[in-house]
Amino acid sequence: MLAACSSRAPRPVPEARAVDGGLRLLGAAAYPAGTLTLGDGPRFGGVSGLARDPLSGQWVGAIDENEPQRLAWMDVAFGATLTVTPLRFTVLHAGPGASAETMAGLELESLVAMPGGGFAATTEGYHDATDIVHQAEVVFVERDGTVTGAVRPHAHFAMTAGDRGHGVRHNLGLESLTRTPDGRLISGLEQPLIQDGSMSNTTRGGLVRLIEFVARRSAGWTPGREWAYQLEPTAVVPGFSSPCPDGENGLSDMLALGDERWLMLERACLLGPPGTPAYNPVKIFEVSSRGAEDVSRLPALAGRSLRLVKKRLVLDVDTLLPRLPPLWATGSNFEALAFGPPGPLGERTILLMSDDNLRPTQTTAVLWLALP
């Protein structure tokens, strides 16, 4: 185990201005590639989902790499400068309720802690190199890495081989997951289903589906209602000419503030001049599903007039960058969102962590923010 060195401490930052108030920065850190390690094992990084294990108090990250597919356990010391200490990896393995198809397609993207121990996670769906389809699922994992089962969304999410004319887009499916106070799981697509319309671009954001999964005594977990959520357009930033591959603005994680109120984390990836880091515009929105229509019976959304989930901006992370250390100059690829410990004034807080894609040019960054 190696405790990681951190970036220099950020200076205090005033609360970001947004409609009806926003989030306040409490602490931050950014770790260059290779500075978070665990002995001779796989490099720590690629964190795409984050949850606090209530039994140990440790933090658990879903690693977006499938060789091997694993969870990363860590300690986080909270303050103006956050300190992340990797502890161990837990490799996932099949339990009696896990199908061979589920195990073959594991590529974790988001993570939530479940009552009584264990986790739920999403695997977003993709085509492998031989065009074998691995469908998007929510999977259930014990603390020791045992995969105990999975549930899939409705049939209109199903991917197709060959022409790819229906369902989840390759590697752009169930990217986010949260658990509501009433016990439902809510997941969201990173980009629209193929039949629902175009991906985000610089003039219009894509229309993605949010879907609930409900635990029913007789049938286990089943898909339920769906809502339509409008993404923001991909940002236009001087000096960054085009999106990264699949880097248009998308939904990367979500967090339930209540049964119908959720925080949504949107981010994009923009390419700069050759040899320079990519730029990651990141925004957090508060949304409400109250009054939004259930679209679960609609196989396609393109061209329809719909009552959408309502949203309002609570933080544009770009407003924080000028007062953070130089390592933050082009933002970070934030994909993980979880509740943090109580803040200095007893307020609720959230913790963001970025996915460095296990690349030498990217960082693992963390932000600790107070809710208003």
Question: Predicted regions span which residues?
Answer:
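Sec-dependent bacterial lipoprotein signal peptides
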Residues: 1-3
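Sequence/structural signature of beta-propeller domains
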Residues: 5-372
